[in-house]
């Protein structure tokens, strides 16, 4: 974890042409209202957002005063984008694929079906130009988005019946946002948009037949095992989900360089922390749900996965046709995925396959 004095020293040493002095560090108070799509104390995403807001204040030694509003406390969970774009609040903590209706290219900056893992996405956004494309998509709305949380590879979802073939998806009401929901539509299912705080109650009530959320660690605290018996893997829809801090662009550009660096550092720290949390806990919580709650973990068959991919190819082409910008984002994303994924297959997956074979790991 970055200590504040170490952080200031690093910024002072690494910012060309920018001289920090004690008066510069003692600038006037900056107020920062952060609205969120997550309920207060919501395990995983909600606690991450609250921790991140507090960390910004801590790194600034109390000068950037953050006030955090959970979903529904200031605006609804899906209203945070407009709240920040209008300037009523300075930032939101959410997932940018929720704004697919505003511009479909937003989805590439959370996760897309058959897309990048979190490690690949981090390289794309951080090194290979993905952040510049993200800025280009968000700028017309008056938004600047920064990575601020990672889910890791996700499970396929919770189902109240077995999925033995693609026919079992027909008529299924499933909570799945983003382009993954569009893929389900191609297979005859009915995707449903629900904010996180309403997933459990709708699954218990039978209003929906299935839902995706994240992975075992986050899903356990949602108590989804109480509402559905079958837990399928792997998820085709979000191979590496990323959360974000969306900032009012004008407000962001009016900040000093040091204040921008403080916010960026807090985001980078939280982005890594959430990924570490899920990697550290997913295996243990999956075992707990199987052992203590009788959850049946099932793998999607190759035939079902083939249909997911067939549906995705149709959705991808439709999405590309939206605009020149969407086409450019899509084509750049998947061109870079060929390179990044090629190495993942040889390096990460090649090694882990051999390790798991020899050590008997996996299901």
Language model feature labels by segment:
Residues 126-129:
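Long, well-ordered early-domain segments
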């Amino acid at each position: 974890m970055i200590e504040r004095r170490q952080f200031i020293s690093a910024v002072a040493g690494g910012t060309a042409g920018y001289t920090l002095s004690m008066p510069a560090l003692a600038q006037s108070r900056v107020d920062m209202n952060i609205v969120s799509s997550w309920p207060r104390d919501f395990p995983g995403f909600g606690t991450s957002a609250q921790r991140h807001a507090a960390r910004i204040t801590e790194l600034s030694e109390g000068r950037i005063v953050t006030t955090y509003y959970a979903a529904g406390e200031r605006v609804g969970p899906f209203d945070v984008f407009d709240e920040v774009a209008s300037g009523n609040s300075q930032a939101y903590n959410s997932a940018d694929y929720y704004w697919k209706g505003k511009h479909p290219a937003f989805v590439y900056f959370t996760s897309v079906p058959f897309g990048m893992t979190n490690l690949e996405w981090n390289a794309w956004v951080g090194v290979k130009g993905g952040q510049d494309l993200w800025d280009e998509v968000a700028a017309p709305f008056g938004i600047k988005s920064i990575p601020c949380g990672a889910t890791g590879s996700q499970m396929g979802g919770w189902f109240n019946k077995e999925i033995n073939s693609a026919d079992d998806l027909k008529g299924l009401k499933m909570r799945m946002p983003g382009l993954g929901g569009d893929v389900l539509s191609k297979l005859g299912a009915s995707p449903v948009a629900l904010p996180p705080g309403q997933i459990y109650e709708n699954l218990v009530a039978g209003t929906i037949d299935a839902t995706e959320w994240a992975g075992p660690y986050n899903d356990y605290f949602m108590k989804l095992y109480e509402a559905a018996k079958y837990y399928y893997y792997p998820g085709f829809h979000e191979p590496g989900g990323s959360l974000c801090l969306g900032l009012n662009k004008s407000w962001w550009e009016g900040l000093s360089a040091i204040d921008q660096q403080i916010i960026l550092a807090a985001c980078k720290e939280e982005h890594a922390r959430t990924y570490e949390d899920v990697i550290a806990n997913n295996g243990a919580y999956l075992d707990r749900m199987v052992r203590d709650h009788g959850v049946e973990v099932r793998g999607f068959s190759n035939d079902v996965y083939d249909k997911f991919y067939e549906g995705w190819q149709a959705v991808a082409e439709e999405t590309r046709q939206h605009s020149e910008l969407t086409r450019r984002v899509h084509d750049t994303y998947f061109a870079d995925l060929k390179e990044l994924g090629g190495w993942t297959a040889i390096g990460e997956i090649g090694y882990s396959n051999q390790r798991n074979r020899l050590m008997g790991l996996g299901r």
